[in-house]
């Protein structure tokens, strides 16, 4: 099972999933409105064959008088794939994206008063709180619970995770820098010392300097080749 960000080509299959699972249905343009306006916030669950078995359709509320907050427009999981934790994972992923992309402080939704399974998920698992009852919210006249989930704790956890990740990155970089500095301060290898001695000998000699230079160049070339081969075999 895979959960990923919804793409434009997923929207028609999301609508099909909605029609199978929920009485609250939307025109295709409403899915495109979400997908194009807030592409980071909607997610789908797909099976091993890449078939969509669940989705969450989410957006940010555009209220200048309130703190930044998101809204879950629709959540659905096909009956064949329920009780696998997909709804919770979809909701958490959408909430996390709201925090990371828009600094959301809370997320809201509406749910039918008669939908006990959804109420249990929202209240007991996802820590949503009922904020008010909206009479006759649905087309058939049923009341809705307006619910909110505070995202402060999730935001703090994400922040700590990023801090630990950044700290770990600095530790790795520090170790690399120390290793480079240690290598730079180490004494020359036996091969390098040998080449230096031969170079000095060539400078001190008179008429034989040309021959010694040729010998030195030949030896240096051989040393480099041998060193390369040893390195390859060691790796």
Curated annotation (Swiss-Prot):
N-acetyltransferase domain span: 1-152
Gene Ontology molecular function terms on file: N-acetyltransferase activity; protein N-terminal-serine acetyltransferase activity; protein-N-terminal amino-acid acetyltransferase activity; protein-N-terminal-alanine acetyltransferase activity; protein-N-terminal-glutamate acetyltransferase activity
Compartment(s) where it occurs, according to its Swiss-Prot or TrEMBL record: Cytoplasm; Nucleus
Listed InterPro entries: Acyl_CoA_acyltransferase, Ard1-like, GNAT_dom
PTM description: Cleaved by caspases during apoptosis. Phosphorylation by IKBKB/IKKB at Ser-209 promotes its proteasome-mediated degradation.
Residues the record lists as Phosphoserine modifications: 182, 186, 205, 209, 213, 216
Tree of life domain: Eukaryota
Biological-process GO terms, alphabetical: chromosome organization; internal protein amino acid acetylation; N-terminal protein amino acid acetylation; negative regulation of maintenance of mitotic sister chromatid cohesion, centromeric; protein acetylation
CC per GO annotation: cytoplasm; cytosol; membrane; NatA complex; nucleolus; nucleus
The protein's Enzyme Commission number: 2.3.1.255
Pfam families: Acetyltransf_1
Family: Belongs to the acetyltransferase family. ARD1 subfamily.
Quaternary structure note: Component of the N-terminal acetyltransferase A complex (also called the NatA complex) composed of NAA10 and NAA15. Within the complex interacts with NAA15. Component of the N-terminal acetyltransferase A (NatA)/HYPK complex at least composed of NAA10, NAA15 and HYPK, which has N-terminal acetyltransferase activity. In complex with NAA15, interacts with HYPK. Component of the N-terminal acetyltransferase E (NatE) complex at least composed of NAA10, NAA15 and NAA50. Within the complex interacts with NAA15; the interaction is required for binding to NAAT50. Interacts with NAAT50.
Protein name: N-alpha-acetyltransferase 10
Originating organism: Homo sapiens (Human)
Phylogenetic placement of the source organism: Eukaryota, Metazoa, Chordata, Craniata, Vertebrata
Gene name of this polypeptide: NAA10
